[in-house]
């Protein structure tokens, strides 16, 4: 089939948007022959329906979107039913990036024993937090995990979870909370502390999911998209001022950032986490699988790697495209 002039991506969360906004607005997509349009699940958009978490797979399979960012559980479920269309093509980030903020009198993880920690209900959120606390030496049987509203519902949706979590700690509703970057910096600016937790490998944020029927019928489009994504990561890492300007304009107002320092901090942390070659790391795949799919008896007989197809990425890599981008850096 012909090359797509517009590629539509549905992002599972506003937290993916630092990269997607730069990808969309940097000119990289146009360089590779297409216009990129990005919608965000749960975020109202002018003259468009608000997409829900539950309809992501159906929207991808119907052709409404060419790619999804996220959708970490459904490909296993679909495959377990005999539907092999959903697959992951690339992974731009392989490490958990949540931050733990807390009351000003709490200075180390061990002090969280017996305390109330606000967290999200998704297995990849509360599950990673529990793992990180255990690695930090915390007896989590003594911790009360307060689950925020499910993603996209109520005042504790991911759209506003950073500022609302800071406010709840300051009101003494809870003692601590895990938040996205850069709300650890914002919390410190408002008198709270942030505790560093042990690193955890996990499939996270911008996982590129596709309908393989579409990919096989439109390989030129799929390869162009992946090459543009790879170049967008390079742009993000090497064009700091331009990337920060895009984030300040397109992302900061949506999530409640307060100042250029928070934009620059967010960019710096993301830049360090993004993979020049967006392959999934084995421990990251294993961790996500164990947190989520392994607990589902309807899908846990599917191997962790069955839903990954990185041969297009490997083809791009073997061509020397990625190495050439970074050769002079």
Listing of model-derived features with the role each one plays in the protein:
Residues 2-158, 165, 175-181, 195-200:
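Short, glycine-/small- and polar/acidic-enriched structural segments
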Residues 30, 34, 79, 134, ...:
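Short polybasic/polar patches that bind polyanions
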Residues 37-45, 261-273, 302-315:
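Short linear loop/turn motifs
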Residues 49-52, 80-82, 101, 188-191, ...:
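Short secondary-structure transition/capping segments
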Residues 154-158, 162-253:
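Pocket-lining segment of extracytoplasmic ligand-binding domains
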Residues 218-301:
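Secondary-structure end/capping motifs
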Residues 292-329:
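Conserved C-terminal helix/tail region of periplasmic/extracytoplasmic solute-binding proteins
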């Amino acid at each position: 089939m012909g090359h797509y002039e517009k590629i539509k991506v549905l992002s599972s969360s506003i937290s993916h948007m630092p990269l997607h906004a730069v990808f969309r607005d940097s000119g990289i997509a146009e360089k590779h022959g297409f216009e990129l349009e990005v919608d965000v699940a749960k975020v109202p958009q002018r003259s468009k329906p608000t997409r829900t978490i539950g309809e992501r797979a159906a929207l991808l399979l119907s052709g409404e979107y060419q790619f999804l960012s996220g959708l970490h559980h459904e490909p296993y479920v679909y495959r377990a039913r005999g539907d092999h269309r959903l697959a992951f093509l690339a992974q731009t980030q392989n490490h958990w990036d949540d931050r733990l903020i807390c009351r000003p009198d709490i200075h180390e993880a061990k002090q969280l024993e017996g305390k109330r920690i606000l967290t999200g209900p998704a297995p990849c959120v509360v599950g990673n937090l529990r793992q990180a606390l255990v690695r930090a030496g915390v007896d989590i049987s003594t911790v009360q995990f307060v689950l925020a509203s499910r993603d996209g519902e109520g005042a504790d949706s991911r759209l506003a979870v950073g500022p609302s979590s800071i406010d709840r700690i300051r009101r003494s509703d809870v003692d601590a909370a895990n938040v996205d970057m850069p709300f650890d910096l914002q919390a410190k600016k408002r008198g709270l502390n942030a505790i560093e937790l042990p690193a955890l490998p996990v499939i996270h944020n911008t996982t590129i999911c596709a309908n393989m029927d579409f990919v096989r019928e439109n390989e030129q489009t799929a390869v162009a998209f992946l090459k543009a994504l790879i170049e967008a990561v390079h742009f993000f890492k090497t064009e700091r001022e331009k990337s920060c300007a895009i984030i300040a304009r397109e992302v900061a107002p949506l999530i409640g950032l307060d100042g250029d320092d928070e934009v620059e901090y967010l960019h710096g942390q993301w830049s360090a986490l993004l993979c020049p070659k967006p392959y999934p790391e084995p421990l990251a795949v294993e961790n996500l699988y164990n947190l989520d799919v392994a607990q589902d008896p309807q899908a846990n007989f599917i191997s962790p790697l069955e839903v990954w197809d990185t041969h297009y990425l490997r083809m791009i890599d073997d061509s020397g495209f990625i190495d050439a981008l970074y050769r002079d850096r």
